[in-house]
Amino acid sequence: MASEPVNGGEGIDGAREKQIIKVYKRKGKGQRKQSSFFALEAAIEKPEGLLENENDNNDVSPAETLAPEFEDPIVVVKNSIEEAALGTNSHGDKNLTEAPSENLPGDDSDKVIDKPLVEAFSQAQPQDDASLAAMDKSEEVPSQIPKAQDDVNTVVVDENSIKEPPKSLAQEDVTTVIVDKNPIEAPSQTLSLEDGDTLVVDKNPIEVSSEEDVHVIDADNLIKEAHPENFVERDTTDAQQPAGLTSDSAHATAAGSMPMEEDADGRIRIHVASTTKQQKEEIRKKLEDQLNVVRGMVKKIEDKEGEIGAYNDSRVLINTGINNGGGRILSGFASAGLPREVIRAPRPVNQLSISVLENTQGVNEHVEKEKRTPKANQFYRNSEFLLGDKLPPAESNKKSKSSSKKQGGDVGHGFGAGTKVFKNCSALLERLMKHKHGWVFNAPVDVKGLGLLDYYTIIEHPMDLGTIKSALMKNLYKSPREFAEDVRLTFHNAMTYNPEGQDVHLMAVTLLQIFEERWAVIEADYNREMRFVTGYEMNLPTPTMRSRLGPTMPPPPINVRNTIDRADWSNRQPTTTPGRTPTSATPSGRTPALKKPKANEPNKRDMTYEEKQKLSGHLQNLPPDKLDAIVQIVNKRNTAVKLRDEEIEVDIDSVDPETLWELDRFVTNYKKGLSKKKRKAELAIQARAEAERNSQQQMAPAPAAHEFSREGGNTAKKTLPTPLPSQVEKQNNETSRSSSSSSSSSSSSSSDSDSDSSSSSGSDQT
């Protein structure tokens, strides 16, 4: 209800009057509507004499002040109240116009103030009497505008006061807000809150850069942690759109960095969906550069491996195979861990593959020369020495003892329980024993039970898979080649004692084929490991160095092992029966000077490991047109030739000594014939040059021609009569006949070649 007028002459002590104050919220143009007002109870004391004269219509009342419990008062203006913002009493005309307040926003046209007298509140809230203080007449109205409360957790701004609102608002539990660079302009306003607090907003625009962090503080002034799941990634397609809340990766993208993140295991993940075309192009270029670097490193590694493999010049296996393009492949099976090397030559027909069973004691000559300084080698093991009493006496050959010890020094390295090669050998042995034919070979042969009285006469070194397994578990094998040798010996004994066509012979052939296929993979892995362990990149002796060192003692017998009784095996002499020849009978106690058996000798000795190695090297150097002759020699008395994938494979371990020595004679005759051809070719060149000189001398009067001959490195000058043209033709005919005879003699036996050479040399002297 409206308040009654108060006469200036009447003093009413303690009179209280309830008034209603209407406050309107300012809104934008065209959207101005009357908002809900709130009632504020204000008990204002009007002391006596405050209003002077009613007739003068100069009613002046002090500015209304809230009770003390309202810390932030709201300053309002009536037509009869002084202007609180200026801090002075206004005395004007009888009807005072409204006084603007500095606290209200906008210009004069936007002011919304209640002009009539203030109406009393319909519902009054009780106030504390102690909080209502009487004001004195002479007391001036305070000119200071009350400040906004510090404890603010809600900001109310005009909807149209911001030019471009942010795309996504900050959440309550987010500490970082990225707003657009466009300034936020908000006029100064006095905003009311629900609990009676006020907040004054300055007119100055708020400018926040797109990368500036704005912290939102709650009512308790605590900064809450940001949760990544509440982040909203920024849309980078439109540069004009303001950014929302972004995660670390999106923030890095906005800053211009690559959208990459690294996992705990070191791998880098690239978010392709959140990248631009320019960033994708940069990533692609970087990946291509890194790929080129990796390819370069791989090429360098391959070149280095090729250089290391070039040192492998000893071959134990000659594997001449068919290539798809009709080429000849000669691959060497290197002992002591050297890799296989492939040499290609044109060869359009079926090829020959001759494999030599590697002896445990036989080691590459390179390893032998390296082991001459055992103290400097960390892989030198005294436990692998051969027994001295099993070798020739020291006075006969001291060098053979030291070299034989050194041959076994490095072979056993890297073969023991727990190694990869050991596990592979054990798995292969288990497969052979579990085969359906394996039961025949899993235990030693029961000679007495089966009544095989001649078994030990034919088979000198019995072996079975059960004994091999026991030796393998006890770590008695010093190298995987010893293991392979015993496995082969088991099946070779069965094939030797049981003729072809019997079941045991067929079983042995089947299991041996399975073993050879699996063993090739194990052996390749072992050779690869040994190549890096033994250090073959060191200075290796050249062939000229080996020739200066002289011949070395042949290795011990092939079948001398540390698995069973070595002394018994080494002391046995080979005993053969008519019609059957043991495959691995090697006599012991040989003298260093071993002579090659003659062609007509009935019982030829077995080749030593070194002799087989030399033979394989000579066979490798043969031209392609001589390989057919090798196949014919092997097929004469041997059935070990296998045709597989257009490749002829021959296991030299199963070839009898007679065939091996015949191959050796074939190589020797070829070398002799080659030397004769060279000598004849040199003579033919000299004769041709001499004929040219004679033809020139016929035109010029020259009584004699000079022939230079070198004997013992000294040049002697001889004066010979000039031959006639008929003599030159006769000499050329003799040269052609001698060259044809030497070529025909290359395929004959050694005795025939010797007679041919003597006859040809006699004809040369005449």
UniProtKB/Swiss-Prot annotation:
Q: What happens when the gene is disrupted?
A: Cell numbers are significantly reduced in most of the organs. Cell cycle reactivation is delayed in germinating seeds, and a premature switch from mitosis to endoreduplication occurs. Furthermore, a partial loss of root quiescent center (QC) identity is observed.
NET domain sequence ranges: 597-678
- Tell me the compartments it is located in: Nucleus
Pfam families according to UniProt: BET, Bromodomain
Q: Which residue spans adopt a coiled-coil conformation according to this UniProt entry? A: none
Q: Where does tissue-level expression of this protein occur? A: Ubiquitously expressed.
Stretches of Low complexity bias are at: 574-589, 736-766
Q: Which GO CC terms are listed, alphabetically?
A: nucleus
* Keyword Transcription regulation recorded: yes
The GO annotation for biological process reads: DNA-mediated transformation; positive regulation of mitotic cell cycle; root development
Q: Where is the segment annotated Disordered?
A: 87-108, 234-262, 388-412, 544-606, 687-766
Which InterPro entries does the UniProt entry name for this protein? Bromodomain, Bromodomain-like_sf, GTE_bromo, NET_dom, NET_sf
> Where are the membrane-spanning stretches?
none
Instruction: Could you list this entry's UniProt keywords, alphabetically sorted.
Output: Bromodomain, Nucleus, Transcription, Transcription regulation
Biased composition annotated in UniProt, kind: Polar residues: 238-250
Residues of the Bromo domain: 416-522
Q: Mostly located where?
A: nucleus
What this chain does, per the entry, is described as: Involved in the activation and maintenance of cell division in the meristems and by this controls cell numbers in differentiated organs. Its action in cell cycle regulation may be directed through the RB-E2F pathway.
Give the PANTHER family listed for this entry: OSJNBA0053K19.4 PROTEIN
The free-text domain note is: The NET domain could serve as an interface to localize different proteins or complexes to chromatin.
Q: What is this protein called?
A: Transcription factor GTE4
From what organism does this protein derive?
A: Arabidopsis thaliana
